[in-house]
Amino acid sequence: MKRKWNLEDTKKLFSKPFFDLIFEAQKKHREYFNPNRIQISTLLSIKTGACPEDCKYCPQSSRYKTGLKKEPLLEIEQILKAAKKAKSSGSTRFCMGAAWKNPKEKDMPYLEKIVKEVKKMGMETCMTLGTLNNSQAKKLAKAGLDFYNHNLDTSSNFYSSIITTRTYEERLSTLKKVRNSGMKICSGGIIGLGEKKQDRMELLMELSNLSIQPESVPINMLVKIPGTPMEKNENVDPFEFIRVIAATRIMMPKSYIRLSAGRENMSDETQAMCFMAGANSIFYGCKLLTSSNPKEEKDQKLFEKLDLFPDYKIQSITEENKNNENLKISDVNKAQYYNAAI
């Protein structure tokens, strides 16, 4: 029976001595996952910029002058080419994001076709397109979409300080529609928005107390983009970030926890502690829109130091991969990539 987390218990969890918390998280992690495996995702912006929303952290909002060049929907051939390269680099999941408040009905045939074509490659698929209605969720599920990303971002109490163009209830409603359609949920949040510790606790409570916990939980460290209202936010204490990762693992033991945006600003040691605390998924080998992800060579070296290997359980391992389990680097057009997690 799934545990229901309340604020008192969550506060006790967060207040544990740091090493006790990490130790508990690592034990919980080993109950459900191989600690030496990591799930690799690649993400692509299929429509960039000119978003009508006012999310204060996001460079894609049309309300802020971030210098981001807007781009129309990509051709399907461009998307499939990127997906093929992603698979060759070791990714098992291909994520696609569009800077919309919600998809229009005229876009649905295009989106459904993309899902079907990427699925033919043997990859898991994920999309983040904004809010969905029931019909759209069912169409995407029927097309074969495995995951739908729709983050809660922060606590319900702090949410209105970050976004006013979409309510918290709308986000929860979309997650419910996604779940009812049969798709899996990818939903997490951002640390560093100016929230208090209790907001972090309440975010994790909201996610963990969903009827079925998200299969994928991206935890982002705010990337401060010039031109957004949050460009001068205070830096996140790495130990506090690691504490959030550990609490996420304990509260959602069966979920993949993705160390998402902000890795470029993390030391190898911080990332290693995040993996120790239960993170077991990353976005790899791609640029996160206007912010950069660690260079492929740097990630490669870190994984080798930590003896981390990609999780190939979604796709069969080719003979080439059997001979060399280390991640392979592909020559990807980085300008097209976008942080689907935020």
Swiss-Prot record:
Q: Which cofactor does it need?
A: [4Fe-4S] cluster; [2Fe-2S] cluster
Q: Name one Pfam family in it.
A: Radical_SAM
Task: Provide the protein name.
Answer: Biotin synthase
Q: Which Gene Ontology molecular-function terms are recorded?
A: 2 iron, 2 sulfur cluster binding; 4 iron, 4 sulfur cluster binding; biotin synthase activity; iron ion binding
Chain positions recorded as [2Fe-2S] cluster binding sites:
C95, C126, C186, R258
Decide whether keyword Iron-sulfur is in the record: yes
Q: Which organism is it from?
A: Buchnera aphidicola subsp. Schizaphis graminum (strain Sg)
Alphabetized SMART domains for the sequence: BATS, Elp3
Query: What pathway is this protein a component of?
Result: Cofactor biosynthesis; biotin biosynthesis; biotin from 7,8-diaminononanoate: step 2/2
